[in-house]
């Protein structure tokens, strides 16, 4: 996981891009934010392994964010991509590489998603304002994590999607609750690899997110639980199920692939920026909880 800690320190060199043509990205869903990031994800068709790539040569020269291309997106895509954007904001805000610049983008994007995703889901092409706001929010979230990077939720979602063919946004939705509680531990087994803090502060960061979304609580821990409840309410509203098992993933197949998923998730480049360095046993526990829908 540490091999890809900083994409400015190259392990591999990508060919120089943009000499023959401009790279113009036109998103057709409100979720990935890829139009504003130096990231891509590819799948090895032989092994089925999903690999995220990071390099500034992958950064588009221009992004055309036009909600007209989103209007007829089906409800399932609207839901999955919208919750994907939620996880982008949450992971960027808690990332060890978060800054004042990325914080503002992440928080404002989250506020817009919670306000407009239900409308976009319900009304589709009949609510162009909601579609436009979601398009903007997804790109803003992309700008946030393009600079702050992501975390272990995305690492686990990449492998869950690759091994069991779940949509990426759904995979993130199924993992995010467990990752929030995992990251918020005040006495973690391990802190991040290169932390920009002298003591764990992720719980306080999540409390700031809760404040921005109007979640009340007497303590930071109360606010975290309120934040998770608010996220769950949004997931329920847009039809996200509560466990991996509910998506028809066979139990034996899941358990047979679990160790491979754990190892690959630990080695995923997104793990490096997570505010708490996970042990493989902790990743395994989160996968199992997500499969059975246990808190």
Regions found by a protein language model. Give the residues of each.
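Flexible, glycine/charged-enriched surface loops at secondary-structure junctions
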Residues: 97-105, 121-133, 148-153, 191, ...
């Amino acid at each position: 996981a540490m091999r890809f800690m900083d994409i400015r320190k190259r392990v591999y060199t990508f060919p120089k891009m943009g000499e023959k043509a401009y790279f113009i990205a036109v998103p057709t869903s409100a979720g990935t934010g890829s139009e504003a990031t130096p990231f891509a994800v590819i799948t090895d068709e032989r092994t089925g392994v999903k690999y995220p790539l990071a390099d500034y040569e992958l950064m588009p020269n221009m992004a055309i964010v036009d909600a007209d291309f989103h209007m007829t997106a089906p409800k399932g895509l609207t839901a999955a991509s919208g919750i994907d954007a939620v996880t982008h904001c949450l992971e960027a805000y808690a990332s060890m590489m978060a800054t004042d610049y990325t914080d503002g983008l992440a928080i404002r994007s989250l506020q817009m998603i919670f306000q407009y995703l239900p409308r976009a889901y319900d009304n589709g092409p009949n609510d162009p304002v909601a579609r436009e706001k979601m398009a903007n929010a997804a790109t803003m979230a992309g700008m946030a994590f393009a600079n702050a990077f992501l975390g272990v939720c995305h690492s686990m979602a990449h492998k869950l999607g690759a091994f069991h063919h779940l949509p990426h946004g759904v995979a993130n939705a199924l993992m995010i609750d467990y990752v929030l509680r995992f990251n918020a531990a005040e006495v973690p087994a391990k802190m991040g690899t290169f932390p920009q803090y002298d003591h764990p502060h992720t719980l306080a960061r999540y409390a700031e997110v809760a404040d921005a979304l109007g979640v009340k609580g007497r303590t930071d821990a109360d606010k975290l639980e309120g934040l998770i409840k608010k996220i769950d309410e949004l997931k329920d509203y847009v039809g996200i199920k509560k466990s991996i098992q509910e998506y028809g993933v066979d139990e034996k197949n899941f358990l047979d692939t679990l160790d491979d998923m754990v190892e690959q998730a630990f080695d995923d480049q997104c793990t490096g920026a997570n505010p708490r360095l996970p042990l493989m046993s902790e990743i395994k526990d989160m996968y199992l909880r997500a499969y059975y829908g246990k808190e």
